[in-house]
UniProtKB/Swiss-Prot annotation:
<dbReference type="InterPro" id="IPR013025">
    <property type="entry name" value="Ribosomal_uL23-like"/>
</dbReference>
<keyword id="KW-0699">rRNA-binding</keyword>
<keyword id="KW-0934">Plastid</keyword>
<dbReference type="InterPro" id="IPR012677">
    <property type="entry name" value="Nucleotide-bd_a/b_plait_sf"/>
</dbReference>
<dbReference type="GO" id="GO:0003735">
    <property type="term" value="F:structural constituent of ribosome"/>
</dbReference>
<keyword id="KW-0150">Chloroplast</keyword>
<dbReference type="GO" id="GO:0009507">
    <property type="term" value="C:chloroplast"/>
</dbReference>
<comment type="subunit">
    <text>Part of the 50S ribosomal subunit.</text>
</comment>
<keyword id="KW-0694">RNA-binding</keyword>
<dbReference type="GO" id="GO:0005840">
    <property type="term" value="C:ribosome"/>
</dbReference>
<dbReference type="GO" id="GO:1990904">
    <property type="term" value="C:ribonucleoprotein complex"/>
</dbReference>
<dbReference type="InterPro" id="IPR012678">
    <property type="entry name" value="Ribosomal_uL23/eL15/eS24_sf"/>
</dbReference>
<keyword id="KW-0687">Ribonucleoprotein</keyword>
<comment type="similarity">
    <text>Belongs to the universal ribosomal protein uL23 family.</text>
</comment>
<comment type="function">
    <text>Binds to 23S rRNA.</text>
</comment>
<protein>
    <recommendedName>
        <fullName>Large ribosomal subunit protein uL23c</fullName>
    </recommendedName>
</protein>
<keyword id="KW-0689">Ribosomal protein</keyword>
């Protein structure tokens, strides 16, 4: 699980999607929708309705004179069944 699903994303859009019971994660670029759905359902004990994936374009990175690119990643938006939820942040 840790190798495929790296971490949850908490951006403005991701927090807005939480109201629609949609959660955003960064995952391994080689992972497909079927394995992501199975991992999320098993690990968090929820029912996944849909999995939407996209691979944002790589950004250029410059360190001194050398120029390269940031690492590739895949972002996933997972829609859960109504009533199910994932606890991302600890309650204070």
């Amino acid at each position: 699980m840790i190798d495929i699903v790296k971490y949850p994303v908490l951006t403005e859009k991701a927090t807005r999607l939480l109201e629609n019971n949609q959660y955003t994660f960064d995952v391994d670029p080689k992972a497909n929708k079927i394995t992501i759905k199975a991992l999320i359902e098993d690990f968090f004990n929820v029912k996944v309705l849909s999995v939407n994936t996209h691979r944002p374009p790589r950004k250029k990175r410059r360190i001194g004179r050398s120029e390269g690119y940031r690492p590739n990643y895949k972002r996933v938006i997972v829609t859960l069944k109504t009533g199910d939820s994932i606890k991302l942040l600890p309650e204070t």
